[in-house]
Curated annotation (Swiss-Prot):
Substrate binds at N12, W13, K14, G175, S214, G235, G236. Pathway: Carbohydrate biosynthesis; gluconeogenesis; Carbohydrate degradation; glycolysis; D-glyceraldehyde 3-phosphate from glycerone phosphate: step 1/1. The keyword Isomerase applies. One of its GO terms (biological process) is glycolytic process. This is Triosephosphate isomerase. Its main location: cytoplasm. It is found in: Cytoplasm. It holds the Pfam family TIM. The gene is tpiA. One of its GO terms (molecular function) is triose-phosphate isomerase activity. Belongs to the triosephosphate isomerase family. Its EC number is 5.3.1.1. It catalyses: D-glyceraldehyde 3-phosphate = dihydroxyacetone phosphate.
Length: 256
């Protein structure tokens, strides 16, 4: 945790969920109404097909609804794409950009990620900018170099704590069950904070840096208690209310 920063626990449902899954979302919202919102801010990013339903369900709770990706353009002949304006219209408050799956599967580079973040801001959304190294880069000892390059290229120079969240997601830990050590996470997050300070100045000290990569209730206290870890970007565990709430519950132990 970082003193003075309210943590954020953000779920990413990815390409999962239908209308039948919305009951899990209701349980997440209800769970935060029991006092968890005093410990942490919460967000669930859902597929575009569910976003308007999710926003309506969560509007009566402290939990926000978000989008999983957006296009760089506001509108146009981009079949199958979703603009930030569309997400905002459907009820989103945040959007994930630069997720490793998008970088790898769609060939997104840092410049595209930065353009998506700027598009999110124009629409009035908070951009969650994802960065992280692959297994090959990690084994080559290039983790910090990769993070430096991604902060430089993916984060717009006008980023502020109110419009931007950074999510460090070691690619090799996503959905694999593998988790870096607390020392590894501490080193990566401290490095990201330093690079943000060089780029953004004093505001970097208040910019939230989330950890993402096989976060679950059983390891949440250890990971989320690391200095400069200001919350979590949660994948598979966000699909089940009990798991997502269990991760958020970690902050009761950490803050207590």
């Amino acid at each position: 945790m970082t003193p003075g920063i309210r943590p954020l626990v953000a779920g990413n449902w990815k390409m999962n969920g239908t209308s039948a899954s919305l009951n899990e979302l209701r349980m997440i919202g209800n769970g935060f109404m029991s006092g968890l919102d005093a410990e942490t801010e919460a967000l669930v990013c859902v597929p575009a097909t569910l976003l308007s339903h999710a926003a309506e369900i969560l509007s009566r709770t402290p939990v926000h609804a978000g989008g999983e990706d957006c296009h760089t353009k506001e509108s146009g002949a981009y079949t199958g794409c979703i603009s930030a304006e569309m997400l905002k219209d459907a009820g989103a408050s945040h959007v994930i950009v630069g997720h490793s799956e998008c970088r790898e599967q769609r060939g997104e580079d840092d410049a595209t990620v930065q353009a998506k973040a700027a598009a999110a801001w124009r629409a009035g959304l908070v951009a969650i900018i994802c960065i992280g190294e692959t297994q090959q880069q990690r084994e080559a000892g290039a983790t910090l170099e990769v993070l430096s390059r991604q902060v430089a290229g993916s984060v717009p120079p006008s980023a502020t704590p109110s419009n931007t969240v950074i999510a460090y997601e070691p690619v090799w830990a996503i959905g694999t069950g593998l988790t870096p050590t607390a020392a590894d996470v501490a080193e990566a997050h401290a490095h990201i904070r330093e690079r943000l300070s060089e780029k953004l100045g004093a505001s970097a000290a208040k910019t939230r840096i989330l950890y993402g990569g096989s976060v679950k209730p059983s390891n949440a206290v250890e990971l989320l208690g690391v200095r400069n870890v200001d919350g979590a970007l949660v994948g598979g565990a966000s699909l089940k209310a009990a798991d997502f709430l269990g991760i958020a519950e970690a902050y009761r132990s950490i803050s207590g």
